[in-house]
Amino acid sequence: MRPEDDRVYDVIVVGAGHAGIEAALAAARMGFRVLVLTVNPDTVGWAPCNPAIGGPAKGVVVREIDALGGEMAKTTDETMINVRMLNVSKGPAVRALRAQIDKISYSRTMKRKLETNPNIVLRHGIVERILTEKGRVKGVVDNYGIDYLGKAVIVTTGTFLRGKIFIGRSTFPAGRMGEFPATKLTESLIELGFEVGRFKTGTPARVLKRSINFSVMERQDTSDEPLAFSFFDEPRVLPKDYPCWLTRTNPETHSIIKQYLEFSPLYGTVKLIEGIGPRYCPSIEDKVVKFKDKESHQVFVEPEGRDTEEYYLNGLSTSLPYEAQIKMIRSVKGLENAIVTRPAYAIEYDYIDPRQLYPTLESKLVENLYFAGQVNGTSGYEEAAGQGIIAGINAALKLRGEPPLILKRSEAYIGVLIDDLVTKGVDEPYRLLTSRAEYRLLLRHDNAHLRLAKYGYRVGLIPKWFYEKVLSLERRINEEIERLKKVIVKPSDRVNDLLTSLGTSPLKESVSLYQLLKRPQLSYSALKFLDPNPIDDPEVVEQVEINVKYEGYIQKMFEEVAVFEKYENYEIPHDLDYDAVPNLSTEARDKLKKIRPRSIGQAMRIPGINPSDISNLIIYLDRKKQ
């Protein structure tokens, strides 16, 4: 018998990608002993596709993870080499940060953070079997036959479940390029009753810096404004040493792709790929086939880090044979002499139907077994990390005997993501978009900590000083808004000349600074000339401007949320006998039995359930309460 401390843990995390890291750190920081098993401990938090974190919706998720006490934002700040705020010219609801990271440094930093946490053991091992006893998880067994016992298990296997790589008609098993797949764990999950599907994704080739002609490409430098993902970090301006570059495909590129389509594992005469690929991150052959009228597509040439000369060709993801790849790449302006260091490839992998999970990400089939990340049918590092921290927090809360953390759609993009997964399921790799969030004006990049720090503090992942800093910010925002309402500006030649010069109409009667700030042409800084006591706090000013200018829209959304909350708070007993509910359609009855929504609100979002089904369900539940 092995020593107990080598065999028995509180929480076992399977996989050390972006989901596994956040799950492990959350559970460990909440006081539990955590074992992290991974195929390769040297590729912790690896970025196998684009060397970037953030983007529309995704960047907000990174801020939400930070507000809950996670690590992705801090490590991005530590290792980023180029960062920009996207959609600056648009409204605050769609603004988000995106950073190029030094992917090698990011991975090493995350590995160090796992290894230096006294509650975490990071160990090599490919998990092959989930151990259960009386419907509850008991532990895992790895490829060496070594068993580990745990009170909770979190599966974060990414693309490793029966992973298979495709380059043209060449195919071989792999979790990602150069790493073994997990070939047997899927069988164990199927034996436990899980429904499993197959998805595919892909990554472009990497090319050597010295072979790129940057002089004919459009340069994209890091921001001149100080920026940071984490609220803990001081925003800073990065040196302009690692720009990204923009070029485009052309008719010759598309001609080469069409010429080799018959050798594509997706489009070719021999169809090798069964899995469905990501709609919002299509391969270049997908784009050429589906958008025949487009003469060119963007290609972003992105640095992979400080200590590597490899560049990532964002926009040229493909599974065509290498002969096609080199010709296609060299047809692109600036890449005529490109030296390929790694070929592009597609990878097919297993995922579980996420409708088999509760909103806590615990499975409905096996108690204390959680799933997070790409194994749930999502795509993207940020989506994975967001699920990871929720799974880690909820596993720890359950072991503590405390209520779970379930973020609402009106509270966080992470809430939207998980609700979509467990309610609607997936028929393609799921990517978060701003359009998926009906309350996106409330779920902004700038207010993530105001929304969520209370939960991070409640579960013990946010220190008291930080939470007090957030509360102080909230208080100062409210105080400044109230002050602006009290400062009255009277019409005068000086005032009206200033307003006219700023492109807005002159005053005919006295108004408050609050009312003036509502005008789209006027910023807080522009009103300083009319304000006896303006504040000089950029964080407060940003929040004040947004809250004042968008007050009508924000208020309308809060009213919608109030209606939403009414149905969200109308709980449905988990053991409800849906066969006893009269007048339900057959489709509604089947779906309600399968998903077992926790509330009327969640039931309303299940595809195929119509308003009359909901009415009949409410009538039945109301009668049961009487």
Curated annotation (Swiss-Prot):
The keyword Nucleotide-binding does not apply. Pfam families: GIDA, GIDA_C_1st, SAM_GIDA_C. One of its GO terms (molecular function) is flavin adenine dinucleotide binding. One of its GO terms (biological process) is tRNA methylation. It comes from the Bacteria. One of its GO terms (cellular component) is cytosol. Its cofactor is FAD. The keyword Cytoplasm applies. Gene3D superfamilies: FAD/NAD(P)-binding domain, GidA associated domain, C-terminal subdomain, tRNA uridine 5-carboxymethylaminomethyl modification enzyme MnmG/GidA. FAD binds at G15, A16, G17, H18, A19, G20. Coiled coil: none annotated. Keywords: Cytoplasm, FAD, Flavoprotein, NAD, tRNA processing. Signal peptide: none annotated. It is found in: Cytoplasm. Homodimer. Heterotetramer of two MnmE and two MnmG subunits. This is tRNA uridine 5-carboxymethylaminomethyl modification enzyme MnmG. It comes from Thermotoga sp. (strain RQ2).
